[in-house]
């Protein structure tokens, strides 16, 4: 099967984990930012996580270098454009990218400037390539909560004009959902769709809470519903899709090896699953790679692929018009 040629949808990808290494060097030189090396191989090695990290925290350390050059409007716009360009070149037809505006204020940018720059980069790529996209605004669970509503307010001006959803991301502690109920409710009032990182690090109860307390329509990763019957049943009952990211799950030790990833069991059991990259640079992957790995490891057919593709379309936060165009590609 020609995996490159398949139309693809990626619903879970982080902007700051998907930066071209050469762009880090270029922007650092333009911005007078000190980086450890001018050698692209060394920069790449600092950005790409090992095949298996000790834990999620070691994986998340790989984001410090790209964030150092994502503190200007020009830097954010370029990186946004290049990510959509890279995806378009491997036949990703619809792409939801997420990022945390709170992480881009080190040089004084406003949330409006940050969000606007990301959206502009995406729109520049949409005008040049056969790709459509949207942004998801991620709040980092470990950061100060004082400006969460400010992020929501700034993004509200871009709702359905490049921004569609609200997310909680970063290190996952048991029971985190309770702390964020008022913020998620505020986002829902403003018109945001909701996806939540949960069940990545062994806590199935977090998935149950994300759906029951926060109204999550999709769950980032969610693989640990496998050991939590209540969460498993709720996800099926509510038709909540899991945004699975196979390579990333192995790197962060959420799963030990791909053959033990629950994605096929979920698929066969009627759980709605999607295949995604998570971080193209940090995980050293593409959608083509992720699809190939899953298809070959679990012996899935072309029909299986397009069944998963249709779930991705239906569970996306795209407009009905875009969804209709995407579904035509599966006929």
UniProtKB/Swiss-Prot annotation:
Zn(2+) binds at residues 12, 14, 197, 278. The record marks 221 as: Important for catalytic activity. Substrate binds at residues 14, 16, 170. Its EC number is 3.5.4.4. Keywords: Hydrolase, Metal-binding, Nucleotide metabolism, Zinc. Belongs to the metallo-dependent hydrolases superfamily. Adenosine and AMP deaminases family. Adenosine deaminase subfamily. The active site is at residue 200. HAMAP family: A_deaminase (MF_00540). It comes from Shewanella woodyi (strain ATCC 51908 / MS32). The lineage of its organism: Bacteria, Pseudomonadati, Pseudomonadota, Gammaproteobacteria, Alteromonadales. The gene is add. GO terms for biological process: adenosine catabolic process; hypoxanthine salvage; inosine biosynthetic process; nucleotide metabolic process; purine ribonucleoside monophosphate biosynthetic process. Disulfide bonds: none annotated. InterPro entries: A_deaminase (IPR028893), A_deaminase_dom (IPR001365), Ado/ade_deaminase (IPR006330), Metal_Hydrolase (IPR032466). It catalyses: adenosine + H2O + H(+) = inosine + NH4(+); 2'-deoxyadenosine + H2O + H(+) = 2'-deoxyinosine + NH4(+). Binds 1 zinc ion per subunit. This is Adenosine deaminase. Catalyzes the hydrolytic deamination of adenosine and 2-deoxyadenosine. It is an enzyme of class 3 (hydrolase). GO terms for molecular function: 2'-deoxyadenosine deaminase activity; adenosine deaminase activity; zinc ion binding.
């Amino acid at each position: 099967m020609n995996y490159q040629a398949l139309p693809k949808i990626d619903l879970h990808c982080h902007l700051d984990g998907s930066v071209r290494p050469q762009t880090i060097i270029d922007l650092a030189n333009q911005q007078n930012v000190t980086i450890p090396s001018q050698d692209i191989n060394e920069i790449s090695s600092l950005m790409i996580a090992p095949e298996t990290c000790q834990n999620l925290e070691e994986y998340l350390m790989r984001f410090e270098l790209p964030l150092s050059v994502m503190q200007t409007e020009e830097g954010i716009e370029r990186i946004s454009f290049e990510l959509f360009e890279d995806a378009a070149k491997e036949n990703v037809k619809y792409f939801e990218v997420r990022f945390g505006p709170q992480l881009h204020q080190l040089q004084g940018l406003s949330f409006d400037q940050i969000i606007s720059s990301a959206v502009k980069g995406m729109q520049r790529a949409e005008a040049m390539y056969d790709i459509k996209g949207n942004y998801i605004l991620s709040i980092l669970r470990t950061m100060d909560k004082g400006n969460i509503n400010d992020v929501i307010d700034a993004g509200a001006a871009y709702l359905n004009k490049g921004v569609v959803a609200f997310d909680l991301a970063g290190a996952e502690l048991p029971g985190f959902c309770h702390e964020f109920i008022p913020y998620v409710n505020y986002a829902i009032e403003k018109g945001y769709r909701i996806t939540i990182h949960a069940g990545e690090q062994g806590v199935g109860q977090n998935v149950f809470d994300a759906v029951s307390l926060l109204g999550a329509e999709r769950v980032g990763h969610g693989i640990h519903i496998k050991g939590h019957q209540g969460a498993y049943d709720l996800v099926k009952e509510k038709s909540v899709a899991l945004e699975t990211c196979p390579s990333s799950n192995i790197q962060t030790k959420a799963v030990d090896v791909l053959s033990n990833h629950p994605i096929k069991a979920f698929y066969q059991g009627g759980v709605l699953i999607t295949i995604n990259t998570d971080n193209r640079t940090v995980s050293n992957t593409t959608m083509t790679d992720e699809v190939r790995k899953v298809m070959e490891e679990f012996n899935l057919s072309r029909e299986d692929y397009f069944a998963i593709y249709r779930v991705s379309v239906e569970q996306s936060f795209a407009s009905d018009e875009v969804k209709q165009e995407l579904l035509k590609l599966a006929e």
